[in-house]
């Protein structure tokens, strides 16, 4: 029985070196191939011109470099790009957001999500499976190749990665960490730990593991300073409450790359956007002595949600109070809403746990017909 070929795309530098040793080849050959794949975007062994003929033949026999198919890509009028990527009959989305001086790629880690946060459209679509390391890094590979070919008024260079797409990345730790290793490898994409940010809803034990094994920048989806409300809107809080979460955050801030934690706070009208909520948030972060930046995210409504986006006045009042109390506070701009790429809209039109396959196939058929 023929052994399955190893997909080299998802192997970090150590893993690809180990693979080359296992087939009787040298580590420096592994580094050559690693660079061809990620730095140069080459996935055909025959096109890797500095490899010997025998090595290329061996690789074709033992390995492959498989890139998922892009079902479609869209560009927004504001420069935002969105890709729908086929991952074995299901689909995930990847979004690139250009800003002055930077370009941020939002990467997915799971097909669906297990956490079922009450305000998140992805969580309402159910959970299929974790992405492999190859499927995670493929999102950056595809974006880097696509954007390098795009001309226009925007700068299409990926300078930052945020693991904030579909899924809870710390629930797919074993695949996300190797993928982030590749993102930060100088032979690949060369991003620093400060430029790669993982966003978690609060899988506390894995926060400690992340600090030990990766140390990328950390963002935490807090959304409320109140355990009672957080139990309702972020159910994982029932397992790891705010006190436990902030204890982990405090240590991460001390040893991580930024010396602070970014707290994400989705503002929902009359749910968590009152001045009393802002007061409680300030008191909480100051009492726990967690160095913090706060990113306010106005809620993006989707069909069937009971939540509403606050008025601009309520958003401004909340922000002003936090800033007045010494916290660097930003309000996330809605980007790519004309292509359903804004935060909270990821894959909402293609991921449905009752008819995911049918909707995906219809989308694929519509794309092929164009």
Swiss-Prot record:
PROSITE patterns: RADICAL_SAM. It is an enzyme of class 2 (transferase). PANTHER family: 23S RRNA METHYLTRANSFERASE (PTHR30544), RADICAL SAM CORE DOMAIN-CONTAINING PROTEIN (PTHR30544:SF5). Signal peptide: none annotated. S-adenosyl-L-methionine binds at residues 167-168, 199, 221-223, 300. SUPFAM superfamilies: Radical SAM enzymes (SSF102114). This is Dual-specificity RNA methyltransferase RlmN. Its cofactor is [4Fe-4S] cluster. InterPro entries: Aldolase_TIM, Elp3/MiaA/NifB-like_rSAM, Methyltransferase_A, RlmN_N, RNA_MTrfase_RlmN, rRNA_lsu_MTrfase_RlmN/Cfr, rSAM. GO terms for cellular component: cytoplasm. Reaction proceeds by a ping-pong mechanism involving intermediate methylation of a conserved cysteine residue. HAMAP family: RNA_methyltr_RlmN (MF_01849). The active site is at 93 (proton acceptor), 343 (s-methylcysteine intermediate). It comes from the Bacteria. One of its GO terms (molecular function) is 4 iron, 4 sulfur cluster binding. Pfam families: Radical_SAM, RlmN_N. Keywords: 4Fe-4S, Cytoplasm, Disulfide bond, Iron, Iron-sulfur, Metal-binding, Methyltransferase, rRNA processing, S-adenosyl-L-methionine, Transferase, tRNA processing.
């Amino acid at each position: 029985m023929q052994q399955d070929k190893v997909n080299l795309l998802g192997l970090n530098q150590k893993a690809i070196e180990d693979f080359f040793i296992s087939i009787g080849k040298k580590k420096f050959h592994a580094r050559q191939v690693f660079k061809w794949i990620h730095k140069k975007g080459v996935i055909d062994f025959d096109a890797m011109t500095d490899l010997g003929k025998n090595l290329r033949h061996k690789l074709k026999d033992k390995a492959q470099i498989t890139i998922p198919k892009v079902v479609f890509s869209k560009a927004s009028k504001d420069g935002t790009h969105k890709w729908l990527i086929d991952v074995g009959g299901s689909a995930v989305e990847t979004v690139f957001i250009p800003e002055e001086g930077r370009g941020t790629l939002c990467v997915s880690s799971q097909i669906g999500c297990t956490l079922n946060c009450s305000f998140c459209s992805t969580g309402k679509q159910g959970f299929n499976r974790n992405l492999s390391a190859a499927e995670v890094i493929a999102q950056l590979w595809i974006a880097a190749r696509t954007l390098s070919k795009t001309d226009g008024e925007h700068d299409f260079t990926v300078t930052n990665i945020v693991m904030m797409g579909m899924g809870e990345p710390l629930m797919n730790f074993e695949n996300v960490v190797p993928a982030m290793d590749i993102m930060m490898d100088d032979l690949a994409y060369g991003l620093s730990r400060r430029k790669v940010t993982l966003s978690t809803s609060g899988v506390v034990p894995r926060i400690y593991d992340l600090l030990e094994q990766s140390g990328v920048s950390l963002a935490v989806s807090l959304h409320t300073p109140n355990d009672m409300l957080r139990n309702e809107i972020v159910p994982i809080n029932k397992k790891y409450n705010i006190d436990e979460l902030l204890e982990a955050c405090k240590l991460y801030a001390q040893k991580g790359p930024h010396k602070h934690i970014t707290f994400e706070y989705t503002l929902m009208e009359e749910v968590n956007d009152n001045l009393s909520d802002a007061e409680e948030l300030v008191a909480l972060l100051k009492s726990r002595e967690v160095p913090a930046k706060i990113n306010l995210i106005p809620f993006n409504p989707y069909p069937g949600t009971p939540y509403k986006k606050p008025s601009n006045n309520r958003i401004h009042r909340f922000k002003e109070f936090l800033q007045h109390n010494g916290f660097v506070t930003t309000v996330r701009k809605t980007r790519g809403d004309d292509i359903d790429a804004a935060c909270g809209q990821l894959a909402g039109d293609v991921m449905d746990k009752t008819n995911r396959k049918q909707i995906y196939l219809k989308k694929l058929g519509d794309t092929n017909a164009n």
